[in-house]
From Swiss-Prot:
Cell compartment(s), UniProt: Cytoplasm
Pfam families: Radical_SAM, TRAM, UPF0004
Name of the protein in its database record: tRNA-2-methylthio-N(6)-dimethylallyladenosine synthase
Gene: miaB
The protein's required cofactors: [4Fe-4S] cluster
Its job: Catalyzes the methylthiolation of N6-(dimethylallyl)adenosine (i(6)A), leading to the formation of 2-methylthio-N6-(dimethylallyl)adenosine (ms(2)i(6)A) at position 37 in tRNAs that read codons beginning with uridine.
TRAM domain: residues covered: 378-441
Organism: Haemophilus influenzae (strain ATCC 51907 / DSM 11121 / KW20 / Rd)
């Protein structure tokens, strides 16, 4: 009888990526097939996130539900992974002794051995270590699930922002070798993937080892990925302003595969608050990056992250954040009220902004960004947009849905053979969270680019300095 696996995932796209890898891994090693119903499962995995408030209590609440399933099925294996597990491993083991396996983001590749240990009679297994980049060497080959795919290029973060737990839960920055990244993407392209999203806590800090002992920068990696035949769209998330260097901006100038949409977290518009957050940049420096980007990509849309009510944030500080939002004209945001994360420096700061004030500031901020997003959407009315068709629409299964380069969802009437391909759609209606349109051109009528070798793409902008060292410019 086929054994079943249920995974519940909270948090960022890195967690979603990790969960998909866990599913692929356990299918290949134990024949475990995914199920949406936890009561059907032989193995239950909870992939946790510590970003949101009361993350630990949310974990124990979920585990309490699964405890009843364990009572009815003593052979059920329960595992907790992700950032809360990394932070609170021993606490979880003591408070929820019925949990069999506790693993961190960097040890998910060891799940098969852990499950075998539990089934062999061991009472519990805890492994929340940071074994560098080992996990990527132990995962099965990538499996495409549609025309878009996420690919992790690095793990961890060295920035140690005062509010953030990531360096403590995922470790410091470690980049995957460039050949490994390119090979994974090439495999996905062969399976029909047309758009790839490069993932990392701080992707623009990527410094990938090459086969000849050199280091590949993030800008160089972007050009190499763009050269892979079949990959027509390239995204990345998330990045840090202090490492958004000019060579990355140059890629926007000369690489059309890189989309005109960027998520670049700023967190606040007040230099005083940014200093307390240890962000290592000013609001002016952030605006300078955006100005340079728009000089080479006038149509680029920018999204960001904001934390309101950080300890010590005054009404004037918040007003400076609102000014930055207006000046940059953000298209969307992920915005949160501040709440302390145990073990972070900010947790020791006096949390002197009232909850009511935090909520009010969040409402004002989100309303402003929603207004700006609505203006962008209205400007798209009557325009033609290139859409990558992802599948049937959630609103109407008789229609298709896809995304524009600027990450707008578009629903339209079309035929099944369009799925996985590009279509040009004329926008006819604008809604709060989506657009509607009519197909005016199919992929066969577009004349998309001809295949180029990686070296041809790199040579487009390669120049040598006075020492004969290659540099890449627009």
């Amino acid at each position: 009888m086929t054994q079943k696996l249920h995974i519940k995932t909270w948090g960022c796209q890195m967690n979603e990526y990790d969960s998909s890898k866990m599913a692929d891994l356990l299918l290949s090693t134990h024949g475990l097939e995914l199920t949406e119903a936890p009561e059907e499962a032989d193995v239950l995995l909870l992939n946790t996130c510590s970003i949101r408030e009361k993350a630990q209590e949310k974990v124990f609440h979920q585990l309490g539900r699964w405890k009843e399933l364990k009572k009815n099925n003593p052979n059920l294996v329960i595992g907790v992974g992700g950032c809360v597990a990394s932070q609170e491993g021993e606490h979880i083991r003591h408070r929820a002794p019925y949990v069999d396996i506790i693993f961190g983001p960097q040890t998910l590749h060891r799940l098969p051995e852990m499950i075998n240990q539990i089934r062999g009679g061991k009472s519990s297994v805890v492994d929340v270590s940071f074994p560098e980049i080992e996990k990527f060497d132990r995962l099965p080959e990538p499996r495409a699930e549609g025309p878009t795919a996420f690919v992790s290029i690095m793990e961890g973060c060295n920035k140690y922002c005062t509010f953030c737990v990531v360096p403590y839960t995922r470790g410091e920055e470690v980049s995957r070798p460039v050949d490994d990244v390119l090979f994974e993407i090439a495999q996905l392209a062969e399976q029909g993937v047309r758009e790839v999203n490069l993932l990392g806590q701080n992707v623009n800090a990527y410094r990938g080892p090459t086969h000849d002992g050199q280091i590949c920068s993030f800008a160089e990696l972007l050009r190499l990925v763009a050269s892979i035949d079949g990959i027509d769209r390239l995204r990345f998330t998330t990045s840090h302003p202090i490492e958004f260097t000019d060579d990355i901006i140059d890629v926007y100038r000369d690489t059309p595969e890189l989309v005109s949409f960027l998520h670049l977290p700023v967190q606040a518009g007040s230099d005083r608050v940014l200093t307390m957050m240890k962000r290592a940049h000013t609001a002016l420096e952030y605006k300078s990056i955006i100005r340079k980007l728009r000089a080479v990509r006038p149509d680029i849309q920018i999204s960001s992250d904001f934390i309101v009510g950080f300890p010590g944030e005054t009404a004037e500080d918040f007003e400076q954040t609102m000014n930055l939002i207006a000046q940059v004209n953000f298209d969307m945001s992920f915005s949160f009220v501040y709440s302390a994360r145990p073990g972070t420096p900010a947790a020791d700061m006096p949390d002197d902004v009232t909850e009511d004030e935090k909520k009010q500031r969040l409402y004002v901020l989100q309303e402003r960004i929603n207004q700006q997003a609505a203006q962008f959407s209205r400007r798209m009315l009557g325009t033609e947009q290139r859409v990558l068709v992802e599948g049937p629409s959630k609103k109407d299964i008789m229609e298709l849905t896809g995304r524009t380069e600027t990450n707008r969802i578009v629903n339209f009437q079309g035929s099944p053979e369009m799925i996985g391909k590009f279509v040009d759609v004329k926008i006819t209606d604008v809604y709060t969270n989506s657009l509607r349109g009519e197909v005016v051109r199919t992929e066969d009528e577009m004349g998309l680019r001809i295949a180029q070798s990686p070296q041809e793409v790199m040579n487009r902008t390669r120049k040598e300095d006075e020492l004969g060292v290659g540099r890449y410019h627009g």
